[in-house]
Regions:
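Non-catalytic cap/lid and distal C-terminal segments of serine-dependent acyl enzymes
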Residues: 1-340
Length: 340
């Protein structure tokens, strides 16, 4: 049984708001004003500047949820304090943005349906933190980390906007879309029979209910991926699927739009390769029993990086996709060491 963390964080935990209507305007009706949590450890001294690390939450999560009490576990600030007390982690400033959406989560890409979250991260969030906190203001002092959708978002930034970052850690991030998403479409269509194959009807029905079941959350997650990777500006909530709703036959054009966001595909771009080479560090890991089959994409991505002579750290561990926050014990010291 894990040991419960009873001690409260010893540093400063503060909050501020950003509002970037032009970037985060969306088809979901979600607010463009967002709350950002910031943790400044007690060891940070006045007059000095420290690495900036941004925590991108996984699907169904928010940076704010990483600050909340957890039974038989640690909040991320508690984890930071413990690692620092053990001498494993140097001081840095940590940022926890609320990027949750009405479709259940965020892939942190630019989408007319969900909002331009990729740009928001480096055009709005970073300057907002730099104006308020003692962080290194050069790209080489900034890092991103996340798990699952958050890991995907961190890697997406590295591939497409690497000039803004010094190091990135991706825990069990979405990649090889055929393996991790392809199997979901038949199940989604079965679920849609409850609403006469109406995507908007299904979403509206969920919004009227008091709770969402696990299977329904997976359907909503597929809708969120569709709104992220191939949004339809004329559809309710911006959602269209890359399959025929009657036969589940794949629409090659629509699926190609999805695949253009796959890190396996994105890595073939020369600009993406140069972005990764420009980083101080790239950390990837995945569980050997990941139930979403993300291990195979991670292995492919790492192997391709090796073939392209792109330096990176790739690790596997004996676990699933779930309950793996302990992997931050490995990635956070690694990131801060690269950025300091």
């Amino acid at each position: 049984m894990p040991v419960h963390a009873f001690s409260q964080p010893k540093g400063r935990l503060e909050f501020f708001q950003t509002d970037a209507h032009a970037l985060l305007d969306n088809l979901l009706g979600d607010p463009t004003a967002r709350t950002v949590g910031v943790y400044v450890p007690q060891a940070c001294r006045e007059g000095e500047r420290y690495p900036l690390l941004i925590d991108l939450a996984g699907f169904t999560g928010s940076g704010l949820s990483h600050l909340a009490w957890k039974g038989f576990g640690e909040t991320v600030p508690q984890r930071i304090d413990r690692l620092m007390m053990q001498g494993h982690l140097a001081p840095a400033v940590y940022v926890f943005p609320d990027c949750f959406t009405s479709l259940g989560g965020n892939q942190y890409v630019d989408s007319i349906a969900m909002g331009h979250w990729a740009r928001w991260l480096h055009e709005v969030l970073v300057p907002g933190v730099e104006a308020r906190y003692p962080v290194i203001t050069e790209p080489g002092g900034r890092g991103l980390f996340g798990k699952s959708s958050g890991g995907y978002g961190a890697l997406h930034q590295a591939l497409h906007h690497g000039e803004h970052w010094g190091a990135v850690a991706c825990h069990s991030g979405d990649m090889d879309f055929e393996l991790c998403y392809g199997r979901e479409f038949p199940e989604v269509l079965l679920a849609l029979t409850q609403s006469g194959l109406s995507i908007s009807g299904y979403i509206e029905r969920l919004h009227r209910r008091r709770r969402i079941g696990g299977g329904e959350m997976h359907v909503l997650m597929t809708f969120a991926m569709a709104a992220s990777y191939d949004p339809d500006p004329d559809a309710p909530f911006g959602v269209r699927l890359p399959v025929d709703l009657q036969t589940c036959e794949r629409d090659d054009g629509r699926w190609a739009a999805w695949q253009s966001f796959d890190p396996i595909v994105g890595l073939e771009r020369i600009a993406a390769q140069e972005n990764l080479r420009g980083l101080k560090g790239l950390f990837l890991d995945c569980g050997l029993r990941d139930q979403y089959h993300l291990l195979y994409g991670a292995r492919k991505f790492s192997a391709r990086c090796e073939a392209l002579n792109i330096e990176h750290e790739f690790e596997t561990f004996d676990d699933t996709h779930s309950g793996i926050d302990y992997r931050m014990d490995r990635s956070l010291p690694w990131l801060v060491d690269k950025l300091a």
